[in-house]
């Protein structure tokens, strides 16, 4: 499962969601407005910035297409 930590006001989060949608990739969006989601984000990445994508055991901070595509390829094999 792919998890996407995001916030409503984050432009990069919107771009990342559009990118995943364009590739027909399913993901679970976790809004960091929730205290629990924010705490989980910090535990995973060591920061409070979004977007953060979790693919398998890999945590990707920011909208890094290369890293995202690499991890997506791994789980699609």
Question: Residues of each region from the PLM?
Answer:
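Short alpha-helical
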Residues: 11, 36, 67
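Short, structured secondary-structure boundary patches
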Residues: 40-43, 47-53
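Thiol-based oxidoreductase modules, predominantly thioredoxin-like and allied folds used
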Residues: 25-38, 47
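ATP/adenylate-binding site constellation spanning eukaryotic-like Ser/Thr protein kinases
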Residues: 7, 46, 65
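Class I S-adenosyl-L-methionine
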Residues: 14-17, 21, 42, 69, ...
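Local sequence-structure signature of Cys/Sec-based thiol-disulfide redox active-site neighborhoods
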Residues: 1-23
